[in-house]
Amino acid sequence: MTAQNENAQAQAEQVEVANEAQLEQTAEVQQEQPVEAELAAAYARINELETYVAEADNREKDIQLRAQAEIQNIRRRAEQDIEKAHKFALEKFSKELLTVVDNLERGLNALDTAVTDEKTQALVDGVEMTHKEFISTLAKFGVEAVGVVGEAFNPEVHEAISMQPAEGIEANHISVVLQKGYTLQGRVLRPAMVMVAG
């Protein structure tokens, strides 16, 4: 019986070893399955985070590009404002000087008919020189006269007081200038008051 017992005991040990091996193998498979599931979940989370980071980078680049564009727009507008300020800083002052020009021209027209001697002529010549110098100085700063007889009527720089037929002047052209107009750097300071040939 001893040999049978030993044999049975050996078989029992073999079965037990086989059962343990099978249990270990089952445990390893069970352990591998959760690890694979966790690994798949981790990869999915990594992909999700990479997508989020890429989207955040794109948003940041977009915000940065918009900010740079806005800065360029602000600079351009500031440069334009400065340029306009330089061009038109004299506008109010120039408008006030137009009255002086008008008065000088009226005085010259009145003196032309009143000249009787050399002293008076010297006075007229002096006023004419002053007038020319004054007009020249205004021109240096971009102030120019508009409204000349025979010039085509332009409603942007001329103000028509009336229409009348005029010999030798085409229709819609200036026949009489009642008051000269002036521009500053191309911008109207005062429109010319004119009569237009009809």
Swiss-Prot record:
Entry function: Participates actively in the response to hyperosmotic and heat shock by preventing the aggregation of stress-denatured proteins, in association with DnaK and GrpE. It is the nucleotide exchange factor for DnaK and may function as a thermosensor. Unfolded proteins bind initially to DnaJ; upon interaction with the DnaJ-bound protein, DnaK hydrolyzes its bound ATP, resulting in the formation of a stable complex. GrpE releases ADP from DnaK; ATP binding to DnaK triggers the release of the substrate protein, thus completing the reaction cycle.
Name of this protein: Protein GrpE
Compartments (UniProt record): Cytoplasm
Phylogenetic classification of the source organism: Bacteria, Pseudomonadati, Pseudomonadota, Gammaproteobacteria, Pasteurellales
PANTHER family, A to Z: GRPE PROTEIN, GRPE PROTEIN HOMOLOG, MITOCHONDRIAL
Coiled-coil residue windows: none
Organism annotation: Actinobacillus pleuropneumoniae serotype 7 (strain AP76)
Quaternary data: Homodimer.
Family, similarity comment: Belongs to the GrpE family.
Transmembrane keyword on record: no
Record Gene3D superfamilies: 3.90.20.20, Head domain of nucleotide exchange factor GrpE (2.30.22.10)
Cysteines paired by S-S bonds: none
CDD domains assigned to the protein according to its UniProt record, in alphabetical order: GrpE (cd00446)
InterPro entries tied to this protein: GrpE (IPR000740), GrpE_coiled_coil (IPR013805), GrpE_head (IPR009012)
One cellular-component annotation, GO: cytosol
GO process annotations (BP): protein folding
PROSITE patterns on file: GRPE
Gene expressing this chain: grpE
UniProt keyword terms in alphabetical order: Chaperone, Cytoplasm, Stress response
GO molecular function: adenyl-nucleotide exchange factor activity; protein homodimerization activity; protein-folding chaperone binding; unfolded protein binding
Chief place where the protein resides: cytoplasm
